[in-house]
């Protein structure tokens, strides 16, 4: 008897509004509607399928099993007329494709191509280093009043420092003459090379203002002549200092034995930065120092005003203001390291969802903006940069900020099926730690206070351990990957879900303004996983707590 194995999932994603799902398998690709759930389009042999909202335009990339379906070829398809609009071939395999109503962005391993989606004209090319995971995000809002940004991880930077590499954090600032110079804006025809700490812009051997670099060279020669006189004077001083340097060399050896570097420099690799690129002006705007470790996931909000990031460690999630680069929220996803698969903002920027290898989806509420000084804003070190022996780890990992306390004035909903001893202990620990947060924040220094202000999740739910999807596409170590998105706010009849609404809680603040007092406003959260399952959960925006599973479908057998 032959066993009919389900196809391997190569790609799965939501569209910009979360109303549709695109999935590509070895057997082809399909487009599903989320509400009501159902398939409405399918074709074969594609590895990437990107939608433009709910329009008939699709950007697809071949699976590579046939010459006509190369992984280097991007094809724009009109699903209404079943016609090919255009095809573009690139020098290497395509890792990701992102679209909004003005721009199309294609990510290769070491290049990013930006097109005008209206006429498919190439506007700009960005040279970068290897981005194997295809981590990239663009803002999707079609409104001209909203920002249109591209965000992607910055290439690693190697810097020389007297501080040993195992003692460094991500907020080291190296004073250099080049850092004080202001870079000119980029021309749309220029390429951007992010190398080291500077942005190199070259166009036909001329500077951006069109003047030849030779004029600048003449001025530099005059400065060099003046500097020669100073160098001669310095040589005399250096000769006098040779004797004292010999004495310092013997002292530096003793410092090196104790782990402190004296005069020798060490090379430090600086990771965890994110580059913001303006898709309208075609200019990079800033580099945000997000984490100490490499970036694992990032996303821009729908209106392009917020950026959320997570590192490979996965314990801390940070949210930044795109205009200023300031860190405005810091959330603690968990205590133990895990791989974060995706981050997603709600359309109104009130919630942020994170999926990870732990199979628990965490929802954070973006309420009161965190008050940070300029020094604290640069203090983006992860938890392991502090000595856990100096801090009660049970208190630190469970503290919540005042912004969460107000939103949890009502007891959150608790799913009785998830009741465990560990959850009971964690809940009591969180209640005690919230009461101590204010006092501890005043006692500990600034670096520790930055950790104390990290907020825990507002709501969460655990994905089912088994599903009916049957897909065999998994992540590293056999983990099932998942991505999330928020739907539009809906109204539900509370009498149909007594396990959520009828637990003796005061729900009058969440009752709709309509005449029917049973209607409740709820926030849908949609999840698709690499095993071929689609989950539809709802979140109580006032109480939080455990989310309720409304429906579940297989996107492979439908």
UniProtKB/Swiss-Prot annotation:
Keywords, in A-Z order? Autophagy, Endosome, Membrane, Protein transport, Repeat, Transport, Vacuole, WD repeat
Q: Region Disordered: which residues?
A: 176-264, 400-432
Coiled-coil stretches:
none
Cell compartments where the protein resides: Preautophagosomal structure membrane; Vacuole membrane; Endosome membrane
Q: What is an annotated GO biological process for this record, any one?
A: autophagy
* Compositionally biased residues, Low complexity: 210-252
Which Gene3D superfamilies does the UniProt record give?
YVTN repeat-like/Quinoprotein amine dehydrogenase
Comp. bias regions, Polar residues: 188-201, 253-264
Which SMART domains does the entry mention?
WD40
CC annotations in GO: endosome membrane; phagophore assembly site membrane; vacuolar membrane
Query: Which parts are the WD repeats?
Result: 4-42, 290-330, 335-374
Q: Which InterPro entries match?
A: PROPPIN, WD40/YVTN_repeat-like_dom_sf, WD40_repeat_dom_sf, WD40_rpt
Give a yes or no for keyword Transport in this entry.
Answer: yes
Please give the superkingdom of this protein's source: Eukaryota
Membrane-related topology note: Peripheral membrane protein
Q: Subunit structure, per the record?
A: Component of the PI(3,5)P2 regulatory complex.
Q: What does this protein do?
A: The PI(3,5)P2 regulatory complex regulates both the synthesis and turnover of phosphatidylinositol 3,5-bisphosphate (PtdIns(3,5)P2). Necessary for proper vacuole morphology. Plays an important role in osmotically-induced vacuole fragmentation. Required for cytoplasm to vacuole transport (Cvt) vesicle formation, pexophagy and starvation-induced autophagy. Involved in correct ATG9 trafficking to the pre-autophagosomal structure. Might also be involved in premeiotic DNA replication.
UniProt comment concerning the protein's domains: The N-terminus might form a beta-propeller domain involved in specific binding to phosphatidylinositol 3,5-bisphosphate (PIP2), leading to the association of the protein to the membrane. The L/FRRG motif is essential for the cytoplasm to vacuole transport (Cvt) pathway, for the recruitment of ATG8 and ATG16 to the PAS in nutrient-rich medium, and for its recruitment to and dissociation from the PAS under starvation conditions.
Its family remark reads: Belongs to the WD repeat PROPPIN family.
Question: Could you identify this protein by its name?
Answer: Autophagy-related protein 18
């Amino acid at each position: 008897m032959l066993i009919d194995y389900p196809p391997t999932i190569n790609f799965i994603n939501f569209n910009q509004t979360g109303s549709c799902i695109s999935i590509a398998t070895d057997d082809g690709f399909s487009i599903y509607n989320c509400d009501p759930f159902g398939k409405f389009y399918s074709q074969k042999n594609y590895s990437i399928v990107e939608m433009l909202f709910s329009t008939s335009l699709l950007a697809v990339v071949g699976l590579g099993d046939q010459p006509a379906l190369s992984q280097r070829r991007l094809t724009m398809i009109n699903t209404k007329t079943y016609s090919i609009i255009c095809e573009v071939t690139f020098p290497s395999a395509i890792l990701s494709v992102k679209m909004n109503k003005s721009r199309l962005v294609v990510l290769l391993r070491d290049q990013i191509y930006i097109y005008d989606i209206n006429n498919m004209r190439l506007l700009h090319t960005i040279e970068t280093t290897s981005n194997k995971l295809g981590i990239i995000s663009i803002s999707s809002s079609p409104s001209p009043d909203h920002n249109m940004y591209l965000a992607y991880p910055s290439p690693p930077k190697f810097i020389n420092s007297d501080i040993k590499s195992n003692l460094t954090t991500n907020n080291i600032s190296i004073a250099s003459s080049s850092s004080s110079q202001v870079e000119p804006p980029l021309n749309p025809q220029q390429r951007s090379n992010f190398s080291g700490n500077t942005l190199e812009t070259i166009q036909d051997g001329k500077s951006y203002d069109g003047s030849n670099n030779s004029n600048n060279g003449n001025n530099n020669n005059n400065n060099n002549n003046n500097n020669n006189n100073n160098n001669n004077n310095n040589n005399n001083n250096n000769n006098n200092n040779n004797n004292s340097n010999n004495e310092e060399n013997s002292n530096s050896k003793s410092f090196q034995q104790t782990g402190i570097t004296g005069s020798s420099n060490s090379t430090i690799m600086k990771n965890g930065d994110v580059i913001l690129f303006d898709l309208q002006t075609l200019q990079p705007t800033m580099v945000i120092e997000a984490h100490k470790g490499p970036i694992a996931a990032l996303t821009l909000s729908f209106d392009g005003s917020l950026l959320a990031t997570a590192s490979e460690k996965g314990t801390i999630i940070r949210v930044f203001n795109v205009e200023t680069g300031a860190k405005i929220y810091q959330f603690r996803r968990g205590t133990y390291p895990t791989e974060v698969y995706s981050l997603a903002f709600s359309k109104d920027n009130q919630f942020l969802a994170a999926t990870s290898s732990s199979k628990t989806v965490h929802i954070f509420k973006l309420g009161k903006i965190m008050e940070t000084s300029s020094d604290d804003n640069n203090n983006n070190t992860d938890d392991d940069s502090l000595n856990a022996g100096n801090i009660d780890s049970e208190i630190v990992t469970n503290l919540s900020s005042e912004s969460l306390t107000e939103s949890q004035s009502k007891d959150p909903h608790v799913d009785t099926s998830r009741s465990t001893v560990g959850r009971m202990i964690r809940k009591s620990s969180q209640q005690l730690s919230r009461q101590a947060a204010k006092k501890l924040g005043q006692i500990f220094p600034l670096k520790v206070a930055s950790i104390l202000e990290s907020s825990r999740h507002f709501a969460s739910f655990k994905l089912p351990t088994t599903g009916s999807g049957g897909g065999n596409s998994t992540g590293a170590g056999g983990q099932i990957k998942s991505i999330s998105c928020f739907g539009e706010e809906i109204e539900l009849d509370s009498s149909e879900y007594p396990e959520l609404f009828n637990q003796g809680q005061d729900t009058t603040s969440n009752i709709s303004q309509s005449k029917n007092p049973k209607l409740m406003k709820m926030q849908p959260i949609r999840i698709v996983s690499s095993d071929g399952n689609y989950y539809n959960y709802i979140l109580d925006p006032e109480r939080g707590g455990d989310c309720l599973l409304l429906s579940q479908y297989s996107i492979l057998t439908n």
